[in-house]
């Protein structure tokens, strides 16, 4: 790195500089993404059963399969292009939009480990809300410390995802995993999930 480059880093950012001009701010990002499925790759995840075999899902598949039902306007509201939806069967852009695998398949998917280094985890969740047979879990050092389904204030299930959060400030510095569960084949027996973030404070 030239002396001019180093000087530029110092003047523009007033931050510590490594040999690669890697910058460490005194004001870190409020939130950063842990898992968003945009790499379309679950090879590092542990899959059990068949519910997650066709995942992740591409695009707003619920809107396409519900387009002829005027009583249900339930866009997925996912982030980016890819997300998890165990009712859906669209695992590539070339696959016909609107295809589904229904509620019958069951299974789980467990993430690789990650370090908790923020106060909150936020995520998008939707679909199954009637019981905890479909849920998201946070596992810390092998124990389930949080679990949630897609229950809303009005107690009705929807494909549309909305944000929930876990306060993980008591687990800072510990290793964690995310586990998604679909153990239901009944009505609303599926889970939608996307965009797990770590947040130092809530935006």
Locate each region found by the language model:
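Extended, low-complexity, turn-rich repeat/linker tracts enriched in Gly/Pro/Ser/Thr and Asp/Glu
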Residues: 117, 127-134, 186-188
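Extracellular carbohydrate-recognition regions
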Residues: 27-64
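Short beta-strands within extracellular/lumenal beta-sheet-rich domains
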Residues: 84-120, 162-165
